[in-house]
From Swiss-Prot:
The keyword RNA-binding does not apply. This is Phosphate acyltransferase. Its main location: cytoplasm. Its EC number is 2.3.1.274. Keywords: Cytoplasm, Lipid biosynthesis, Lipid metabolism, Phospholipid biosynthesis, Phospholipid metabolism, Transferase. GO terms for cellular component: cytoplasm. Coiled coil: none annotated. It comes from Rhodopseudomonas palustris (strain HaA2). Catalyzes the reversible formation of acyl-phosphate (acyl-PO(4)) from acyl-[acyl-carrier-protein] (acyl-ACP). This enzyme utilizes acyl-ACP as fatty acyl donor, but not acyl-CoA. HAMAP family: PlsX. One of its GO terms (biological process) is fatty acid biosynthetic process.
């Protein structure tokens, strides 16, 4: 376990670049004073932001590059133009070289997945990585994957995702045997497409001592905490994520409008202010920011591109925690024990956004 957690940042990633990445790193440093940073990107822009954060500057090293991956680049374009030279690639490569323990980027999801896969390579039997994140529920938190790294996938792919997600939940939630469910349009065994029904059969047949398969989970079951791990292919998983984030913001706006409508509602808000603050904090999408790319020979964390400094700080926190929990080693151990789940998945395709 490293004395310091070394975090490589794609400082040019996301919608706002260093103006969000640097302050976000400073916020996270305040929570994790044993972290140090490598910031890749335009040194002039980065140094300008660092000037306002002397504590961060003291534990940071800036590596200049003029090349940044845009949010509109296709994965193939990003690899052709940015391999070896872009801020995104260099942050990932720092993990490969052992100069950093984790890379964090708010950049283009498809490009990040392609570069991470090309640079770090995937674990034996894993065709493409999956994005996994913690999801707040009424029972605590769940691990949900895949949130958009791949589109589609056969039953073996879903089975491998279940094994990786269960390993992550075991580490994060200190669970000996987490429950695992497959996201589906119904809980009945006859529901869903052929791939998901076959995946359910494979997971039941495993009878794994390391997780308990509980069957299918409908969309509303995610928020109910129906399982410790919810597994989906990336297309459906990403839609579920964006729908939940949009709903949270919508409810927040409804409450804000309702509480300011009349003088009675304003007085009522004053009495219930602490309860409303707790609700707002629970529903804040920023606090769930930071998806981990599982299935790689290294740790890469994806932040939302349009996040704020506070939101990016949470993504950095996720990267820090993954290193401190020694997640990669523990997931590898679990995958080696469940070697039958590690099969190639030729039907899974790259996400492009």
């Amino acid at each position: 376990m490293p004395v310091k957690v070394r975090i490589a940042l794609d400082a040019m990633g996301g919608d706002f670049g260093p103006s969000v990445i640097v302050p976000g790193a400073a916020i996270s440093l305040g929570r994790h004073p044993d972290a140090e940073f490598l910031l890749f990107g335009d040194s002039a822009l980065i140094e300008k932001e660092l000037a306002a954060h002397p504590a961060l500057k003291k534990v940071s090293r800036v590596i200049h590059t003029d090349v940044a991956v845009s949010m509109h680049d296709k994965p193939s374009q990003a690899l052709r133009r940015g391999r070896k030279v872009s801020s995104m690639w260099l942050a990932i490569e720092a993990v490969k070289k052992g100069e950093a323990d984790v890379a964090v980027s708010a950049g283009n999801t498809g490009a990040l997945m392609a570069m991470a896969r090309f640079c770090l390579r995937t674990l034996p039997g894993i065709d493409r990585p999956a994005i996994a994140a913690t999801w707040p529920t009424v029972r605590g938190d769940s691990v949900v994957l895949d949130l958009g790294a791949t589109i589609g996938g056969d039953a073996a792919h879903l089975k491998a995702l279940a094994v990786m997600g269960a390993a992550m939940a075991s580490v994060l939630f200190d669970l000996e045997r987490p429950t695992v469910g497959l996201l589906n349009i119904g809980v009945e065994e006859i529901k869903g497409g052929e791939e998901i029904r076959e995946a359910a059969e494979l997971l039941r047949a495993m009878q794994s001592p390391r997780f308990e398969f509980v069957g299918f989970v409908e969309g509303d079951g995610i928020g109910k905490g129906a399982a410790d791990v919810i597994v989906s292919e990336g297309f459906s998983g990403n839609i579920a994520l964006k729908a939940a984030e949009g709903t949270a913001r919508q409810i927040s706006e409804y409450l804000k409008a309702a509480m300011s409508r009349t003088w009675r509602s304003k007085i009522g808000y004053l009495f219930a202010r602490d309860a409303f603050k707790a609700l707002k904090d629970k529903m804040d999408p920023n606090k769930s920011n930071g998806g981990v790319f599982l299935g790689l020979n290294g740790i890469v964390v994806k932040s939302h591109g349009g996040t704020s400094a506070d939101g990016f700080a949470y993504a950095v926190d996720v990267g820090y925690d993954m290193v401190r929990y020694d997640l990669l080693t523990k997931i590898n151990q679990t995958l080696n024990r469940e070697a039958g789940a590690l099969v190639s998945t030729p039907t899974a395709q790259e996400a492009v956004s």
